[in-house]
Amino acid sequence: MAAWANGVRAVLLDVSGVLYDSGGAGGGSAIQGSVDAVNRIRHAGLKLRFCTNESQATRSHFAQKLKRFGFSISEEEVTAPGPAATRLMKERGLRPHLLVHNDLLPEFESVEKSDPNCVLIGDAAENFSYKNVNRAFQVLINLQKPVLISLGKGRYYKETDGLKLDVGAYMKALEYACDIKAEVVGKPSPNFFLSALEEMGAKPEEALMIGDDIVHDIGGAKSCGLRAVLVRTGKYRPSDEKHPEVTADGYVNNLAHAVDILLASQDCNQ
């Protein structure tokens, strides 16, 4: 029996690359067995949270997309960086210049954006043109104390037609050009995982993270005291299992495989 499966009371699921692969005409497709795996987690009475750095849509649109793929999910079960970034900016009186996907813009309607004193960057996809990235650079370089807020720092993610550059690549370009360090809202920030646990009413030692990113999903969760399992779907690469800095508590073929092991452990402990 896998040691990582013992005593789990709460499950945090990464989404893209674990539940579904994004892209294509329909916006993506569910990974085989993942819809049923989510239902089995619920049926077992485990606490469940969907933890994503998704920054191409609001939580509401994101939940609706997953429902179209067949998943049982509500907006309230999604932990995403957009709402956290909104709270942060309001608390600190920050007025962002936005470099984000058009579908995420409604997330920031309540934030003052005139005379920007920071830049907020997300996965802007086609909006990552030279003109737009350079404009973000110009805003930052002209600030006395430049502030760059990034919705995650992933290097790449998988869509149905291949791997795509993520927000982290563009974040690093702005960091380098302006000689600054971005503030990351989202995985692997400890606050992201701790916020998800608080929303679930769960403790780190009783929670399991399942993801496809060895650094941001697995490393981020383990730094907060969670157990973490890497799936061999999504952006997974065989070299991840020999990562020099991060070792997962387990490696599984996909989400369905992880749930098989997890629920077998639950049965043995009853």
UniProtKB/Swiss-Prot annotation:
Q: Where found?
A: Cytoplasm; Nucleus
UniProt cofactor(s): Mg(2+)
Q: Which Pfam families match?
A: Hydrolase_6, Hydrolase_like
Q: Per UniProt, where does Mg(2+) bind? A: 14, 16, 212
Q: Which UniProt keywords apply?
A: Cytoplasm, Hydrolase, Magnesium, Metal-binding, Nucleus
Q: Which GO terms describe its molecular function?
A: inorganic diphosphate phosphatase activity; metal ion binding; phosphatase activity
**EC assignment:** 3.1.3.-, 3.6.1.1
Q: Which reaction does it catalyse?
A: diphosphate + H2O = 2 phosphate + H(+)
User: According to the UniProt record, what class of enzyme is this?
Assistant: hydrolase
- Give the cofactor note text: Binds 1 Mg(2+) ion per subunit.
Q: Where does substrate bind?
A: 14-16, 52-53, 187
Q: What family name appears in the similarity comment?
A: Belongs to the HAD-like hydrolase superfamily.
> What exactly does this protein do?
Phosphatase that hydrolyzes imidodiphosphate, 3-phosphohistidine and 6-phospholysine. Has broad substrate specificity and can also hydrolyze inorganic diphosphate, but with lower efficiency.
Protein name (record): Phospholysine phosphohistidine inorganic pyrophosphate phosphatase
From which organism does this entry originate?
Answer: Xenopus laevis (African clawed frog)
